[in-house]
Amino acid sequence: MVTGIGMDIVEVLRVAKAVMQDNFVMRVFTPAETAYCRSKGKQAAQSFAARFAGKEAVLKAFGTGLRGGKLTEIEILNDNLGCPQVSLTGYFAAYARQKGVKNIWLSLTHTKEYAAAQRVMEAEK
């Protein structure tokens, strides 16, 4: 049963400027996300922006906003096929368990100028 849908779009340039500040990167991204995005070279800003949009989409699907948790408790990394996978820790992991969340489906996309994410949260009936 679908229990939440979230979607977000961000400007890559805006995120590119923000990730120039280490404080922003440490507050928003996990070390693994940061390493992944920086490994993308010229497309690093697009990768950061897509993950930022993904985190926002997760928050919207939960319907909670950032209350009680931190963005670093939502980690988005790709599996060996390149599909984005969401891992939750801390507050958001506990919230997902409480809501009976079984699957989190996430789609990320980006162009030179924009990054977007859509997320569907599925729980047991």
Describe the predicted segments one by one.
Residues 1-125:
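Core catalytic alpha/beta fold that binds nucleotide/phospho-ligands
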